UniProtKB/Swiss-Prot annotation:
Keywords: Hydrolase. This is Bis(5'-nucleosyl)-tetraphosphatase, symmetrical. One of its GO terms (cellular component) is cytoplasm. One of its GO terms (biological process) is RNA decapping. GO terms for molecular function: bis(5'-nucleosyl)-tetraphosphatase (symmetrical) activity; phosphatase activity. Belongs to the Ap4A hydrolase family. InterPro entries: Ap4A_hydrolase, ApaH, Calcineurin-like_PHP_ApaH, Metallo-depent_PP-like. Pfam families: Metallophos (PF00149). Signal peptide: none annotated. It is an enzyme of class 3 (hydrolase).
Length: 274
């Protein structure tokens, strides 16, 4: 069995298929792990979601911020933007099935035999593996409830839940987990989240900010962390135990696939329109 990890697909389905053809991906014996943000901006979010749903146990994804936003759009909590290219997906006859499938996906996944953890944006350095499991599970439980739109999705948008408070309860606790696992890039030196700076570290001019992965973390020492979200990094992190896989395909760059067993990255340039 081969394990392949793919960066933010964001509707770039043709590029994904090219990548999988390059490695002869076979869902009957291989697994495809996705760092989230399967949808938005690229030309074919519908085909992308249908494909991952069809993979069954051979496909493992986590939720990204755009995937959660899709839940809000489907629930009429947010307005669809033409630039997101999500109208065909939202109007699809099987949208209810796809949304139900998406709601079952977690915020983190583990591959214990290889000591790998996958999330969309990263893991707060304050968190142990036990805390990561616990907090992500709380969000997953909320997403699976029948009132998930009112109880979670309608309240998840907030920049105020930027600091980890172990004593927090209810929506504030869930908000921090969502913010950290799906939106995080930089932290202030005291450890609270910044939501504004998206530049690569070499271009960040705020001396109070550091990338989340530059903070001391026991989890980073014991595990390989696989993540996406931060396209400006273009996969460049100076640590073999960090796998940054978002390389900006939906922005005209390329899609990256990491073959775990060979520790090899394979890329596919964004295809030209038409």
């Amino acid at each position: 069995m081969a394990h392949y990890f793919v960066g933010d697909v964001q509707g770039c389905f043709a590029e994904l298929q090219r990548l999988l053809a390059k490695v002869d991906f076979n869902p009957s014996c291989d697994e495809l792990w996705a760092v989230g943000d399967l949808v938005a901006r690229g030309p074919d979010s519908l085909a992308t979601l249908r494909y991952f749903q069809s993979l069954g146990d051979a496909g493992k994804t986590v939720l990204g911020n755009h995937d959660l936003h899709l839940l809000a759009l489907h629930g009429k909590l947010k307005r669809d933007k033409p630039s997101d290219n999500l109208t065909p997906l939202l109007n699809a006859p099987d949208i209810a099935s796809l949304i139900d499938w998406l709601r079952q996906q977690p915020l983190m996944r583990e591959l214990p035999e290889h000591k790998i953890i996958m999330t969309h944006a990263g893991v707060p350095p304050q968190w142990s593996l036990e805390v990561l499991r616990q907090e992500s599970q709380l969000v997953s439980q909320a997403l699976k409830q029948s009132d998930y739109l009112d109880a979670l999705i309608s309240q998840m948008y907030s920049d105020t839940a930027e600091r980890w408070e172990p004593s927090a309860i209810g929506i504030n606790r869930l908000r921090f987990c969502i913010n950290a696992l799906t939106r995080m890039r930089y932290l202030y030196v005291d450890g609270h989240l910044d939501f504004d700076c998206k530049q690569p570290p070499e271009d960040c001019t705020n001396p109070q900010l550091r990338p989340w992965f530059e903070f001391t973390s026991a989890l980073r020492q014991s595990h390989t962390l696989v993540f996406g979200h931060w396209a400006a990094l273009m996969g460049k992190v100076n640590d073999p135990k960090l796998k940054a896989l978002d390389t900006g395909c939906c922005w005209g760059e390329y899609l990256t696939l990491w073959h775990l067993e060979k520790d090899q990255k394979i890329t596919q340039k964004r295809l030209k329109k038409g």
